[in-house]
């Protein structure tokens, strides 16, 4: 089998030379891929990409055999392209998403994960149509970047906790090659999908869209029981999804060419990723966190 693409969310900040620091952090965890935000996830503040050490980042990655095509950017949380109630907020979301797409193109990271959003006080189906409308609008700015809509837990008024929602969106967007899906294992579990029956779950995916539409996987355990609709991530092996189930996901041959990204909680202000990556690759839960 090819190498397993396994990494995590890493920081990007000025004191660590932005993207160079992101690569160094990933290397320190023995990760061979990673995910970043291009700026604060809850704000519009952004540092110009000219100052992010893009060339140095790619040189450093080359020396460690990390391929830029495997990297992932997470879009800001404040983008809600599902808003069918407030036109101004929807337009803000679309314009901010366009900015993020441009930044991904400049950094040369080809996958942009996006939370589909919430219907707030609106109608559920209208929200799905707003998502489609937004994706059609931003597609002109996508040259090498694909948007991966993330599976959600169904907390509050979130849309896209059901695979059928993704089928509807993927069937109706104009530029189908520019949109895919990010599977989040915690969110899927919290939404009611039993991932311990992984083969059966993959069949459910195939009833709605092709497996090659899955562009990346967020690998998280869950602090809550199945169908809880909570979205509280647990460390690998310490939650209700379970270590063996997550090992099955990591080593699934159908997904060998896409990145599995950990977004698990820090323990005592320390990242757990080095231990989690080691345990997953060794297929052995060592209970060291």
UniProtKB/Swiss-Prot annotation:
Name the positions where Zn(2+) 2 binds. 150, 184, 218, 263
Q: Which cofactor does it need?
A: Zn(2+)
Which keywords has UniProt assigned to this entry? DNA damage, DNA repair, Endonuclease, Hydrolase, Metal-binding, Nuclease, Zinc
- Reactions the enzyme catalyzes: Endonucleolytic cleavage to 5'-phosphooligonucleotide end-products
**Enzymatic class:** hydrolase
Gene3D superfamilies from the UniProt entry: Divalent-metal-dependent TIM barrel enzymes (3.20.20.150)
Q: Which EC number applies?
A: 3.1.21.2
Q: Which SMART domains match?
A: AP2Ec
Sites where the protein binds Zn(2+) 3: 187, 231, 233
Q: Which HAMAP family match?
A: Nfo
Q: In UniProt terms, what function does this protein have?
A: Endonuclease IV plays a role in DNA repair. It cleaves phosphodiester bonds at apurinic or apyrimidinic (AP) sites, generating a 3'-hydroxyl group and a 5'-terminal sugar phosphate.
Its name, as the record gives it, is: Probable endonuclease 4
Q: Lineage from the top down? A: Bacteria, Bacillati, Mycoplasmatota, Mollicutes, Mycoplasmataceae
Gene from which this protein is expressed: nfo
């Amino acid at each position: 089998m090819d190498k397993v693409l396994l990494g995590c969310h890493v920081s990007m900040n000025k004191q660590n030379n932005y993207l160079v620091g992101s690569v160094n952090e990933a290397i320190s965890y023995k990760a061979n891929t990673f995910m970043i935000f291009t700026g604060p996830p809850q704000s519009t503040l952004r540092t110009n990409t000219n100052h992010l050490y893009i060339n140095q980042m790619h040189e450093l990655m080359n020396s460690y055999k990390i391929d830029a095509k495997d990297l992932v950017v997470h879009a800001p949380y404040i983008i809600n392209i599902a808003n069918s109630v407030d036109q101004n907020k929807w337009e803000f979301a679309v314009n901010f998403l366009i900015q993020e797409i441009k930044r991904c193109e400049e950094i040369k990271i080809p996958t942009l994960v996006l939370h589909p959003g919430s219907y707030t006080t609106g109608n559920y189906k209208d929200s799905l149509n707003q998502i489609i409308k937004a994706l059609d609008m931003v597609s002109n700015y996508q040259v090498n970047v694909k948007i991966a809509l993330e599976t959600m837990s169904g907390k509050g008024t979130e849309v896209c906790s059901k695979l059928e929602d993704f089928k509807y969106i993927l069937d109706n967007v104009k530029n189908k090659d520019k949109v895919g899906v990010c599977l989040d294992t915690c969110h899927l579990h919290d939404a009611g999908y039993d991932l311990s029956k992984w083969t059966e779950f993959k069949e459910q995916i195939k009833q709605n869209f092709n497996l090659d539409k899955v562009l990346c996987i967020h690998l998280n355990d869950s602090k809550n029981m199945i169908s809880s609709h909570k979205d509280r991530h647990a460390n690998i092996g310490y939650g209700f999804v379970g270590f063996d189930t997550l090992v099955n996901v990591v080593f699934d041959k159908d997904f060998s060419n896409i990145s599995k990204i950990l977004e698990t909680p820090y323990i005592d202000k320390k990242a757990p990723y080095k231990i989690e990556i080691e345990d997953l690759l060794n297929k052995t839960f060592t209970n060291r966190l």
